Curated annotation (Swiss-Prot):
Protein name: Cytochrome bo(3) ubiquinol oxidase subunit 4
Assembly: Heterooctamer of two A chains, two B chains, two C chains and two D chains.
Task performed by this protein: Cytochrome bo(3) ubiquinol terminal oxidase is the component of the aerobic respiratory chain of E.coli that predominates when cells are grown at high aeration. Has proton pump activity across the membrane in addition to electron transfer, pumping 2 protons/electron.
Alphabetized Pfam families for the sequence: COX4_pro
Stretches that traverse the bilayer: 17-37, 47-67, 78-98
């Protein structure tokens, strides 16, 4: 197999991965819109449907667009992702904690 065919096969495989990821993402975006616009479920169930679709979409993006998997080759990428998630967790929940305490201690 010459170099051109190897590159073309790799490109076709990557293009297929992007198309599958896009279709999954599109499907996971349409489901919450359909459920909320047509009032299929109660508000609580709609919230959980939206949350489940959002978490599924995050996983789909990690797998199909960022190409993250648990192989030894990607171990540094996984470690970097975990570090970023910890930092985002600290920033978001720290901000919520600070705003709650500010709201609690404000004299009206």
């Amino acid at each position: 197999m010459n170099k051109y065919k190897k590159i073309k096969n790799n490109f076709d495989k990557e293009k297929k991965s992007y198309i599958v990821g896009f279709l999954f993402s599109l499907f996971l975006t349409i489901i919450p819109f359909f459920c909320t616009l047509n009032h299929l479920f109660s508000r609580k169930i709609n919230f959980f449907v939206i949350l489940l679709c959002a978490l599924s979409q995050i996983i789909i993006h990690f797998i199909y667009f960022l190409h993250l998997d648990f192989s030894k080759k990607n171990s540094w990428n996984i470690i970097s992702l975990l570090f970023i998630l910890i930092i985002v967790f600290i920033i978001v929940f720290g901000s919520i904690w600070i705003m709650y305490n500010l709201n609690h201690h404000v004299i009206l």
